[in-house]
Structure formats: C-alpha cells, structure tokens
Amino acid sequence: MKIKSIKKITAEPTTVYNIETEKNNNYFANGILVHNCFSYFFKANNPSMKNSETAMELTSVDAKKLIDALGGNPTNGRGRIMYETFYKRKFLFHWGGLADPGCNFELKNGVGYEIMKALGELNYPTLFSTKGANVFLHKKYVSLFEKYAEQNNFAFQVSMVTNDQETASKIEVGVPSPKKRIEIIRRYSEMGYWTILRLRPYIVGVTEYSIDSLLEEALDAGINAISMEFYALDSRASGEAKKRYVWLAPLIGVKDLPAYFHKLSPSERGGYRRLNRLVKEPHVKKVYKFCIENGLEFGCSDPDFKELTTTGSCCAMPDHYPKNPLLENWTRQQMTYHLKEARRIYHSTGQIAKMRFCEVYKDENYFDDPVLSGDHIIETTLCAADRQRLTYRKILRNYWNNLRSYANPRNYFHGKVIPCGVDENQDLIYQYNPMPYEKRWAEEGIILGGK
C-alpha cells in the first residue's frame, strides 16, 4: 500500500496531515484512522515514505513559539491551551519519549539548545530521555547544564539495551557506545542532577548477558533510579519492519521471532506482543532487588510488574525531592501510581485495594478538553461531529468498562487487577490481584510492602 498524497491542513489550535493511500483510498484524517487505514504511525512501518516524492521534509519544532508558551506568552491557540493546562502549573516536561533530544540533528542545528536554555531560565522541571552522548557530553551543553545545576530542575534518563559494545553496535546502529552513555550518567550525577538508568528496551536473550556489569557501572556512575520496559513486537508491522525481525532473531537466539512472541505473549493484549510475566520475572527480580539493596528508586513502564514501581512514576522520577520539589510534579492520575499503592497496602496491611474510575482519573481539565484529545490516534466509527467532542475521559472510560478492549485494565495488566463490581456511575470497580510471585519473593525476604 503506497501513499498517494499528503496534505497539510492548518486548523488552529492543531495542525492536521491528511494522508491518502492508493488501492483502497485510506485516509489518516483529523487525528483518526478512517476506512480501514493501517498503521502509518511509525517510521519503521512506512517503507513507502522512504525516497518517495511524497515524503515530508524533516523540520524542527518552532522553538520561539514553544519558549513563548512555556514563559506564559503563547502566540497561538495551541500554545494558550498548553500554557493554561500544563506549563502554568509547571507540569513535568518529558523530552525524549518519542524523539531523542541528543540526536545528531541537534548537534548540527542546535534548535534544542535554545529550548534547554529557556527551560533552565524558567526553572521548568524537565526529564530528558536520551542515548545522545555526542550532545550531552559536548562542552556547549555541559556548560549550559552546569549553569543550572544548583536549581536541579533537570533529570536525565540514559537508555541502554546492553553493556556489551559489540552487541550494542549490532542492535543500536549508529548510537554512542554504552561506555559513553555511562559517562552521561556520571557527568550529570556529579553536577547533582537526578539520573536514571533507562533499560529500554530490555531484550530477553540479549540484555541479561551484561546486566550485572551494567548495573554496577551505572551505580558507580551515580544513578538515583532504574526504569525498565521489555522489548515488544508489533505483529501488524510492515514488510520493511519484518526484515528487521529476521535480522534481530539470531541476536536474541531464536529462529522465528514473530512465532516466538506469538507463543509467549498473552492474547488479551492483541497484536502488540508482550512476553508473559513468567518470562520476565527473573529479569525484573534481579533489577528490583538491586534497587532495594542499593537505595535506588525502581520504575517499570512495562504493563507486567508495574505494581513494583516504588514512586508511582514508571520513569522512576522522585516522589520526594527536596532539592527541587518541582521534579515531583508528575501526575498521580494514572494506573502505575494506583497499582503501586495497591501493592504497598496489600503487603503492609493485607488489605485488597479497590480502584474506581472516578478516583483514578479525577477532575483535571485536560481529561475533558476535546482539543487535546485530538492528539490521540484511535480507530473509530464515530462521525466527525462526535469525534470533535470526544475527550480523554470518554476514551479512558470506554477502555475501563470494555472487557474486550486490549487497553482494558484487566487485559493490559494481564490479570493484575480484576473487576469486582460496578459503582454508582455504572463504571467497573477493579481490585488488586495478588499473584504467586509475591508470596515467593516475600518468603525470600524481598521487601514488597515499602514504598
């Protein structure tokens, strides 16, 4: 399926790209997939975009508009919404969840530098997720962050797959070496910043062979926390992405990677294959124990073992940070936090915590703003008028109450929470579901009732 045309449509406060494809005339329009359009979200799944006359040119964010909005002087509708909803409240700014702030484009163009400088001047709480040693060890950037070290408004997650240089060069082609990335941790830890070893992704069959040295070197470099998530495989991938599966399989030690993931992944989660808890348990156990024994925070972005997160932030951000309390300003209105609380309550008191939709997702204006929900890409049969009125609260409520949805809490967390009733709003009530591993770990003396 080839892309036929891409049209940019400016409709304040959002920008929309309409994508038409050949053969069945699918469209990605106004934030939704229509007429059975299929997965044009990811670069790896877009072979038709490569060397194509229809390919969009890579452009940077408008740094001035973003800086103006962060500082309370937005120049457009989108900026005003973001300021009133997030920036004014100094909501944690996560930079690097989708695009690395330390990529080589930044080294060449320096657009991000101006934004980083503004974030420092505003004392704005910011979390960087990066592999970009060429940027974050560059004298220009090091000097910038040294300037703001006393106010401690920045935190740094450094992403690693393996500590073995040869293996890393095969899996993370063109990425700075593990040694250089450890040096990022050391440099910014020495400045006094909150630093996190980000095991992303933890690849079973690869990461465990160097995990001991990686943990020890990261600890020696000064980490405050570790966050982890396991490699997952998208069964809906394009032919180009599937070629990568063939290439990756022998590095992991399997013949057929899709078949391996299909066999060992819970079907309740649909086509995005995540290995089951039993496969992941020994790996999580090692990292969790390491954190507990060394006074580190533990975060889990994986749906399995998310309950073990010690602060309620899957990124392992602090929940108590006297150096700059602004770094604590991440939302508690998400299931990672509530699973953590349920685990803590169970292992401290023996009580089974219950979770209600109205308590997990409380009154926050961003849940009820239809403009913001336009950022959420979904497949829907809604007409355009209903889609324009759709909010995150409605989306979340549908997932919450639809036991057939892959995003339903019971399915997404693979039984870690189970429905136990219906409340006065006709929303399902879920309860924490203790699992056998918790008893085993507790008997071994592993602390589960702490933070």
Tell me what each language-model feature is.
Residues 242-451:
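C-terminal accessory extensions appended to soluble enzyme cores
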Residues 28, 41-48, 262-268:
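Short acidic (Asp/Glu) and glycine-rich catalytic loops that position anionic groups and cofactors
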Residues 38-155, 187, 383-400, 404-451:
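Conserved Radical SAM active-site core
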Residues 67-279, 283:
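Conserved AdoMet/S-adenosylmethionine-binding subsite of the radical SAM
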Residues 14-18, 25-26, 92, 125, ...:
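Beta-sheet entry/capping signal
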Residues 24, 42-44, 161-165:
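Short connector loops/turns at beta-strand edges and beta->alpha or beta->beta junctions
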Residues 1-36:
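Autoprocessing domains of the Hint superfamily
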Residues 20-22, 30, 35, 129, ...:
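Generic beta-strand/beta-sheet core signal
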